[in-house]
Amino acid sequence: MKGMRSNIPRALNAGAQIACVDNTGAKVVEIISVKKYRGVKNRMPCAGIGDMCVVSVKKGTPEMRKQVLLAVVVRQKQEFRRPDGLHVSFEDNAMVITDEEGIPKGTDIKGPVAREVAERFPKIGTTASIIV
């Protein structure tokens, strides 16, 4: 997993319910915790674009519901700044279900994906139809 070039604000708290935008059968997932999050004692973990999270499937097909999986944040509403000075924000918050290596479990991703995610997880970048 590569480092991020941008300083991404962590806008998604643990407990946030977010749309899943791949074709795995999950529709809404809830963030349980954030992988490699280093915070202060008793602070709730937060996630931003490109962070891998442990999630629980809240809505979706009966086979997918109540499963605990890994997912990567591909879009967030909170604006962030790229090194070239461009400010980027999306219309919604979205995640893609992956495995430990960051390879997506689905074969299709709906909507755009941030360029930072495509750089950090190349397999998500190849699966995405639009990279912003």
Curated annotation (Swiss-Prot):
Provide the alphabetized UniProt keywords.
Answer: Ribonucleoprotein, Ribosomal protein, RNA-binding, rRNA-binding
Q: Tell me the superkingdom of the source.
A: Archaea
Q: Name one GO biological process term.
A: translation
Q: What does this protein do?
A: Binds to 23S rRNA. Forms part of two intersubunit bridges in the 70S ribosome.
Q: Which family does it belong to?
A: Belongs to the universal ribosomal protein uL14 family.
Database matches in HAMAP family = Ribosomal_uL14
Record NCBIfam families:
PRK08571.1, uL14_arch
Under what name is this protein listed?
Large ribosomal subunit protein uL14
Whose protein is this, by species? Methanosarcina acetivorans (strain ATCC 35395 / DSM 2834 / JCM 12185 / C2A)
